[in-house]
Amino acid sequence: MANDVLPDPSTTFGKRVRDRLAKELVLWLTTVGADGTPQPNPVWFLWEGEDTILVYNRPDANRINHVRLRPRVALNFDGNGLGGEIVVLTGTAELLEDFPLAHENEPFAEKYAERTAGSFDGPEDFARKYPVAMRIRISRVR
């Protein structure tokens, strides 16, 4: 159920946020390391609806342990190179047990079909290498 955290879709910013969530292929996921240092990483993602984003991860990715210990995260899209068009989302991440693998998640598989074919040996190879699903519930957008 949506909790209206995204900006009003009738505004320019609200439209931009939704457009980027729906169309962009990469966003930056920032977790916090054991020493308190922010750890940004580019990730493939799926906007699941109003307030959730899904990310698949390698099982040995440091962000897995970061999220277990400190589930608050930030996400952001690249800007326009001049400091504009910035979208920052904050929220809480959770690791999902018994969740469909990436190639079994039809919306994710469709979004990244071209990428998994070009950068991996197909969607099953990506799913094998990135089996850990993480859902981020967005709590704020700026």
Where are these regions (language model features)?
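Short, surface-exposed beta-strand-loop junctions and turns on beta-sheet-rich folds
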Residues: 61-63, 82
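Short secondary-structure boundary segments
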Residues: 78-80, 138
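Short, basic/aromatic recognition patches
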Residues: 2-28
